[in-house]
């Protein structure tokens, strides 16, 4: 495994690339986190996928479905189109990418613009399939101690 190339498409060795984030080192930015999440799908690292999702959304994830999809797919590649980081406290970002895979139903391509937020030195994926239960004037679910309308609401599509 020490000589394995990272599945994220960087061309670097896994241990020097996404493997260090899988081992617990915080990803330094949203794009690195997104690439490490793609690699986690390739490698079947369901726990990592859950742990790097916004903590208030983790309970709404279907771990079994994630693991099954990961295992039943042959991952064909990742292309990052853009990465936009927005300043502020906390920092937010969008990463636009296309992931390709093959499964029992053929070859697939999925293009997505994902949202991310940084909290306490860690970046988290904001999963659009798990609703954030917050009113505009409620505390933001990301833990920033700001109102939702002043924090993550603009980054949830």
Curated annotation (Swiss-Prot):
InterPro entries with a match to the protein in the record: NTF2-like_dom_sf (IPR032710), SEC_C_motif (IPR004027), UPF0225 (IPR023006), YchJ-like_M (IPR048469)
Transmembrane stretches, start-end: none
Superkingdom classification of source: Bacteria
Family of the protein in this entry: Belongs to the UPF0225 family.
NCBIfam families documented for this protein: PRK00183.1 (NF001213), PRK01617.1 (NF002449), PRK01752.1 (NF002486)
UniProt-recorded name of the protein: UPF0225 protein Psyr_3863
């Amino acid at each position: 495994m020490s000589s394995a190339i990272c599945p994220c498409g960087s061309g670097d060795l896994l241990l020097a690339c996404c493997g260090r984030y899988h081992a617990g080192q915080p990803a330094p930015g949203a794009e690195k986190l997104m690439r490490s999440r793609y690699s986690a799908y390739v490698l079947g690292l369901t726990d990592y996928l859950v742990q790097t999702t916004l903590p208030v959304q983790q309970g709404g994830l279907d771990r079994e479905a994630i693991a099954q999809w990961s295992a039943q797919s042959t991952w064909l590649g990742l292309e990052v189109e853009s990465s936009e980081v927005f300043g502020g406290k906390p920092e937010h970002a969008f990463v636009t990418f296309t992931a390709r895979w093959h499964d029992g139903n053929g070859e697939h391509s999925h293009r997505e613009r994902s949202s991310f937020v940084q909290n306490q030195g860690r970046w988290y994926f904001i999963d659009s399939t798990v609703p954030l239960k917050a009113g505009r004037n409620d505390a933001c679910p990301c833990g920033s101690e700001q109102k939702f309308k002043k924090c993550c609401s603009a980054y949830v599509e």
